[in-house]
Design a protein with these regions (language model features):
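Active-site activation/catalytic loop segments of kinase-like enzymes and analogous catalytic loops
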Residues: 197-237, 252-268
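Inter-domain helical "communication" segments and dimerization helices
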Residues: 86, 90-95, 102-104, 110-132, ...
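Conserved N-terminal boundary motif of the eukaryotic protein kinase catalytic domain
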Residues: 6-14
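Catalytic activation segment of kinase domains across protein kinase-like and atypical kinase folds
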Residues: 173-197
């Protein structure tokens, strides 16, 4: 393992905090930003993966903030990246200007379609279909019957070599002026776009009633529902999207199962995920 520059947080000022960690700068006009992930994501392997993925995504021509180097903060590892000054996430814009919620949903849809049309580096990035099959095998919070139903569904999904974000939602596009950037890329892969869209559906319809989720995204339950409705209409080109919603619900169940691969859930998380898989299976796999 290489030796990395050691950072003292006393020299930095915190400017942000999200679900995965905190961000810092040395001064108000700094062109670089320090990102320190939460404990589970600050081990060397996780940060090196984040660094390599960011470089690989940028090489595909996808707009992402430049990542410069890995550093150490105490026992944790972190990254120094390009600071996008004046940036706001689409979810923050929805909070600050609620009347623009539909506009932000249409923007996420357009940028999503651009992403889904981009050929991926399938030698570097994983197949989401393969990951889903592996997750079904490894999960301990799904019954044997539901595991077979999920496996049958995944096997019916065609392999796809186009890009997927992995955490496709309005908090993961930031906007600065007329420029938009994708962030939080550690789950990047390739596959059917509905894997990403199922994740968005899960947030907007299944997790949205939770106060913690509303706080993370700075959006109300009503805004989440408006956001999904506009996104679905824009994506399908139709005002009626019940069939699209039902398909998204099926992929949402897979998204929960994929937590087994992405975050190695603890006992309490397994109970949580198991509850929502059963709920989704009952509604969308019956």
């Amino acid at each position: 393992m290489d030796t990395y520059e050691t950072i003292n947080l006393n020299d930095y000022t915190q400017i942000g905090e999200g679900g995965n960690g905190k961000t810092y700068v040395t001064s108000a006009d700094s062109d670089e930003i320090l990102k320190v992930n939460n404990a589970r994501l600050s081990k060397w392997e996780a940060v090196k993966h984040e660094y390599d993925v960011s470089k690989a995504v940028a090489s595909l021509g996808i707009p992402v903030p430049a990542i410069y180097r890995i550093v150490q903060v105490g026992d944790a590892y972190a990254t120094i990246s390009q600071r996008i000054k004046g940036k706001k996430s689409l979810s923050r814009i929805c909070h600050d200007e609620p009347e623009r919620t539909e506009e932000m949903a249409r923007l996420l849809c357009r940028k999503g379609k651009e992403l889904f049309a981009t050929e991926c580096n399938t030698q570097f990035f994983p197949s989401r279909r393969d990951q889903a099959l592996l997750a079904i095998e490894q999960t301990s919070f799904v019954s044997c019957k539901n595991r077979e139903r999920l496996r049958s569904f995944v096997e019916s999904i065609a392999e796809d070599s186009h890009c997927l974000h992995g955490d496709f939602q309005p908090g993961n596009i930031i906007q600065a002026g007329t420029d938009n950037y994708w962030i939080d890329l550690d789950r990047f892969g390739h596959g059917d776009p509905m894997f990403d869209i199922g994740h968005l559906f899960l947030i907007c319809h299944i997790y949205a009633p939770m106060k913690r989720v509303q706080d993370i995204f700075h959006m109300t339950l009503e805004q989440f529902h408006r956001f999904w409705d506009t996104f679905a209409k824009e994506y399908t080109g139709q005002d009626e999207h019940a069939v699209f919603d039902a398909l998204a619900g099926r992929f949402a169940a897979l998204d929960v199962i994929l937590r087994t691969i992405f975050q190695k859930p603890n006992f309490v998380e397994k109970l949580f995920f198991g509850f929502y898989v059963r709920k989704l299976m009952k509604q969308y796999y019956s």
